[in-house]
Amino acid sequence: MNFKYSILFICFVKVLDNCYAADDLTTLRNGTLDRGITPDCTFNEKDIELHVYSRDKRNGIILKKEILKNYDLFQKSQISHQIAILIHGFLSTGNNENFDAMAKALIEIDNFLVISVDWKKGACNAFASTNDVLGYSQAVGNTRHVGKYVADFTKLLVEQYKVPMSNIRLIGHSLGAHTSGFAGKEVQRLKLGKYKEIIGLDPAGPSFLTNKCPNRLCETDAEYVQAIHTSAILGVYYNVGSVDFYVNYGKSQPGCSEPSCSHTKAVKYLTECIKRECCLIGTPWKSYFSTPKPISQCKRDTCVCVGLNAQSYPAKGSFYVPVDKDAPYCHNEGIKL
């Protein structure tokens, strides 16, 4: 997997950046990479599975949107849980190891109902092929369709199970971050309001580097948008949220020798923040050419802790986050906000 990511994003990044999250996949299927060698990553809503985690289903169960009532929680007329909807990225799955760990942290610490959207075929993970990385442009195009699926599922939660939008947050990694943004746009179009929060974990860079708000994750897609940047090669290196955390300057991460490792670290960092064993502190950082404010000078009104409580801090903008190599990754000099 790491080798494939490196090949895709280092060797083909310039080609892929000509693609975009199109409404019409015909453009992408007729693209320069489609010459009979690309996998068929065509999106079909029927292929999507929902991995549902709760305290009585800690290992998760697999459901389809059409058969939710097979799980007793969805036999109720109202769901009162806080809900986290997880959306994976390219070549991944809804129950990948890192998402599974995050889901279990969410149900253990905060009793969330966690729903991980598995769109693996549309993300080109359903194939045992050496050229599946060439399906990236199709996966990019599929993000809008998956976003609409998530929005439609949200409508079901709101209207059938009386879940307020203020109880729903989306957490997306890589392409899943932009998918979350498209879902956020769609629920507003459906006049459902805004999600409480979207957390974009190293939002994908290739094919999104020059995109404006309508075609990527944007700070207007939820009441609060938090972005955690960990790879300048695989992720976007510009602000997309209410707060943008640049971990280790957002370039590469301690202990990582490959871009895919840094890209994935965003998921691991958030999981540790959910566990609340420590606070990864973001200190104001205006630009790459400026010096971040020292952590020792941090106060609650100027700095922000990464994670589910970030919205409780008043500061917004760009933040530098120092981290250690090993979990729980704290490098906060004993400062508490």
From Swiss-Prot:
<dbReference type="GO" id="GO:0016042">
    <property type="term" value="P:lipid catabolic process"/>
</dbReference>
<feature type="disulfide bond">
    <location>
        <begin position="213"/>
        <end position="218"/>
    </location>
</feature>
<feature type="disulfide bond">
    <location>
        <begin position="279"/>
        <end position="330"/>
    </location>
</feature>
<dbReference type="InterPro" id="IPR013818">
    <property type="entry name" value="Lipase"/>
</dbReference>
<dbReference type="InterPro" id="IPR002334">
    <property type="entry name" value="Allerg_PlipaseA1"/>
</dbReference>
<feature type="signal peptide">
    <location>
        <begin position="1"/>
        <end position="21"/>
    </location>
</feature>
<dbReference type="Pfam" id="PF00151">
    <property type="entry name" value="Lipase"/>
</dbReference>
<keyword id="KW-0964">Secreted</keyword>
<feature type="disulfide bond">
    <location>
        <begin position="41"/>
        <end position="124"/>
    </location>
</feature>
<keyword id="KW-0443">Lipid metabolism</keyword>
<feature type="disulfide bond">
    <location>
        <begin position="256"/>
        <end position="261"/>
    </location>
</feature>
<dbReference type="InterPro" id="IPR033906">
    <property type="entry name" value="Lipase_N"/>
</dbReference>
<dbReference type="GO" id="GO:0008970">
    <property type="term" value="F:phospholipase A1 activity"/>
</dbReference>
<dbReference type="GO" id="GO:0031640">
    <property type="term" value="P:killing of cells of another organism"/>
</dbReference>
<feature type="active site" description="Charge relay system">
    <location>
        <position position="202"/>
    </location>
</feature>
<feature type="propeptide">
    <location>
        <begin position="22"/>
        <end position="35"/>
    </location>
</feature>
<keyword id="KW-1015">Disulfide bond</keyword>
<feature type="active site" description="Charge relay system">
    <location>
        <position position="263"/>
    </location>
</feature>
<dbReference type="InterPro" id="IPR029058">
    <property type="entry name" value="AB_hydrolase_fold"/>
</dbReference>
<dbReference type="GO" id="GO:0005615">
    <property type="term" value="C:extracellular space"/>
</dbReference>
<keyword id="KW-0354">Hemolysis</keyword>
<keyword id="KW-0442">Lipid degradation</keyword>
<feature type="active site" description="Nucleophile">
    <location>
        <position position="174"/>
    </location>
</feature>
<feature type="disulfide bond">
    <location>
        <begin position="278"/>
        <end position="305"/>
    </location>
</feature>
<keyword id="KW-0378">Hydrolase</keyword>
<comment type="similarity">
    <text>Belongs to the AB hydrolase superfamily. Lipase family.</text>
</comment>
<keyword id="KW-0020">Allergen</keyword>
<feature type="disulfide bond">
    <location>
        <begin position="298"/>
        <end position="303"/>
    </location>
</feature>
<comment type="function">
    <text>Catalyzes the hydrolysis of phosphatidylcholine with phospholipase A1 activity. May act as an allergen and induce hemolytic activity.</text>
</comment>
<keyword id="KW-0204">Cytolysis</keyword>
<protein>
    <recommendedName>
        <fullName>Phospholipase A1 1</fullName>
        <ecNumber>3.1.1.32</ecNumber>
    </recommendedName>
</protein>
<keyword id="KW-0732">Signal</keyword>
<dbReference type="InterPro" id="IPR000734">
    <property type="entry name" value="TAG_lipase"/>
</dbReference>
